[in-house]
Amino acid sequence: MKKKKTYGEVYALGQYISMSAPKARRVIDQIRGRSYEETLMLLALMPYRACDPILKLVNSAAANARHNMSFNEATLVISKAEVNEGTTVKKLKPRARGRSYPIRRPTCHIRIVLQDTSFDEFEEDFFSLKKDAWEKK
């Protein structure tokens, strides 16, 4: 299945982050739909361990937007943010009398998509002009 190319969006993907998916979703649900600057303040003040890798991903997505697409950081909004479960690393903890207990280390994949809101206004104007030209024929 081919992925649709969307203009005005950039993303950052973090794979195999050693954290369970529900713990990361708790933070992701708070930042979805917010502006970039508001997200930075929220993540700096939240008391969860998931905030650090998510903050790195948000900064990485903003750097992608600035460097690759020349977007302004003030107009960026987190349009999509999703957390998927990754592989589970299985280990054995040695115990007394030659026994062992299994230990599961869950991982997750986090994807942050930033959208430029100024591009939306341009896109609406552009497609409205294009539609009018089509109707005239």
Swiss-Prot record:
Cross-referenced Gene3D superfamilies: Ribosomal protein L22/L17
GO molecular function, one term: rRNA binding
Any one cellular-component term (Gene Ontology): chloroplast
InterPro entries given in the database record: Ribosomal_uL22, Ribosomal_uL22_bac/chlpt-type, Ribosomal_uL22_bac/org-type, Ribosomal_uL22_CS, Ribosomal_uL22_sf
Compartment list: Plastid, Chloroplast
Function, as annotated: This protein binds specifically to 23S rRNA.
Subunit structure: Part of the 50S ribosomal subunit.
Name listed for the protein in its UniProt record: Large ribosomal subunit protein uL22c
Organism: Oenothera argillicola (Appalachian evening primrose)
Gene coding for it: rpl22
